[in-house]
């Protein structure tokens, strides 16, 4: 690099370089040695580890079929939302291990993990999934109980006399 001795030389050099506005971030495919995309998803107290590979639409959670693990139809619908959003219902096999939290939090964590894994497998899916809000980590957690209160915000019954 050339020696810069004055402020005018520095401004001349920096004006020639590209601005950051023109640079577009490039998302590349991230796969492991077996051709799988790996991602972690979180929701409430649940953490899900998700592996996505080409297949026939089989979803396994903690070594169980997903419809056996999540008995409620609402939870199964939450789980399948990212795959349905990109119209690839039967193109990927999904293996997930999920710990912590309740069933609702676990379903949300697996959905978040599937969405991230889909973007790692095929970066073009990112715009669709981002627009639907599947890539955003839902940071809402239960508010802690405070001392002097019955619950987080509920006070004990007040009596004037």
Swiss-Prot record:
Q: Name one GO molecular function term.
A: structural constituent of ribosome
Q: Which GO terms describe its biological process?
A: translation
Taxonomic superkingdom: Bacteria
A Gene Ontology CC term for this entry? cytosolic small ribosomal subunit
Keyword terms of this UniProt record: Ribonucleoprotein, Ribosomal protein
Pfam families found in the cross-reference section: Ribosomal_S9
Family annotation (HAMAP family): Ribosomal_uS9_B (MF_00532_B)
The entry's family comment says:
Belongs to the universal ribosomal protein uS9 family.
Identify this protein by name: Small ribosomal subunit protein uS9
**Which species is this UniProt entry from?**
Bartonella quintana (strain Toulouse)
């Amino acid at each position: 690099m050339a020696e810069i001795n004055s402020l005018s030389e520095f401004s001349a050099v920096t004006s020639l370089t590209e601005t950051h506005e023109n640079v577009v971030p490039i998302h590349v495919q991230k796969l492991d040695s077996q051709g799988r995309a790996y991602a972690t998803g979180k929701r409430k107290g649940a953490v899900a580890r998700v592996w996505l590979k080409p297949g026939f639409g089989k979803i396994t959670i903690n070594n169980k079929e997903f419809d056996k693990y999540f008995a409620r139809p609402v939870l199964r619908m939450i789980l399948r939302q990212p795959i349905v959003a990109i119209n690839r219902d039967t193109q990927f096999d999904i293996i997930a291990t999920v710990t912590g939290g309740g069933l609702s939090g676990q379903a949300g964590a697996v959905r978040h993990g599937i969405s991230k894994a889909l973007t790692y497998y095929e970066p073009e899916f990112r715009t669709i999934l981002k627009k639907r809000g599947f890539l955003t980590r839902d940071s809402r957690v239960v508010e802690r109980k405070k001392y002097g209160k019955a619950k987080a915000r509920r006070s004990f019954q007040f009596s004037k006399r």
